Amino acid sequence: MRAALTTALALLLLPAAALASSPQQTIEAFYRWRMASAMTGAPRGDELKQLRPWLGRELLCLLQAAGELRDRAAAAQPDEKPPFVEGDLFSSVFEGPQRLRLGAVTQRAGQAAVELRFEADTGAQPPVFRWSDRALLRREQGRWVVVDIEYRARVEFGNHGALRESLRAALEPADPALNWPGEAATRCAR
């Protein structure tokens, strides 16, 4: 049921993504979809298709490769937890955000940076956890797309650095046990 609702929401938001005339509109549409979806870890088939309007070519390629690595690891080592199987890749916090407010936007020469102010309910004290990350965008094929997320929250169990950097580091080395050739990051950068 949730998958059907997510798909319906994505279809409603696709026209908005195609018409997004500013970095802010792209970010708002992307995170509206992201927070409504049940996606965890690297996106799977339909999720990847739904993300296409909002993400840059290289980032989409890296996420697809992360999904392939996850699937190979799960098949080759069924008793071990594969990489990219869970957690929110699009924010610092593993559980992901529930609410978003946009902060400062800087824009120059077809590139933009948008401050992201996230909130999530904790069910503990304090009841709301707040953090900030930053989205980097670029114009590709006449539209604004997300090309990276800088993780800025200082959390013990979460993402650190930046999304592209994390994906590249995990995807580049070959792993014969998984029949993984590596070099995915190099291939995606072309």
Say what each PLM segment does.
Residues M1-A8:
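Bacterial N-terminal signal peptides that target proteins for export
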Residues L13-A17:
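N-terminal signal peptide c-region/cleavage motif recognized by signal peptidases
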Residues L19-Q25, R134-R138:
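N-terminal helix-cap/turn-to-beta initiation motif at the start of protein domains
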Residues S21-K81:
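Core segments of small alpha/beta cavity-forming domains
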Residues G56-V128, A184-R190:
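Surface-exposed, charged secondary-structure patches
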Residues R101-A104, S132-R139:
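Hydrophobic/aromatic beta-strand elements that line small-molecule binding cavities or substrate pockets
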Residues G110-E115, D121-S132, E140, V145-R190:
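Low-complexity, intrinsically disordered terminal/linker segments enriched in charged
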